[in-house]
Amino acid sequence: MGGNVLPIHYDPKTVKQLTKEITVASCIGAAQGALFSIASALLLRRFSSVYRNVRTQVRVFYHCSWISMGAVFRADKQLLKFQTNYYREEQKRREKIMDEAAERGLFLEDESLNSSRSTT
């Protein structure tokens, strides 16, 4: 079968852009999670006798949990934004191709608009 044909979203440029956006979003989310964990830990230390008496490992786990949760949530949100923008651009590209074909008097079906990349 056609093992050398890849969908358009496997384009190295698209993957590189997505990787960059997710990395930046993860770092921002991790920083936000760290700020929240530090602020909440200070409040817990002040007002909670249970938190004051837990071991260091539990406190480290608490901070790591908030940092990783912030990174994951922010990265997921950025992925959804990227996906929305990607599909919007793809729809614009398809509409442009259809308009150009209509001006030339050509008939195109939707299947012919799907961009595929050949790896050869």
UniProtKB/Swiss-Prot annotation:
Glycans are attached at residue 114. The keyword Glycoprotein applies. It is found in: Membrane. Keywords: Glycoprotein, Membrane, Transmembrane, Transmembrane helix. Coiled coil: none annotated. GO terms for cellular component: membrane. The chain crosses the membrane at residues 22-44. InterPro entries: Rcf3. It is a single-pass membrane protein. This is Uncharacterized protein YBR255C-A.
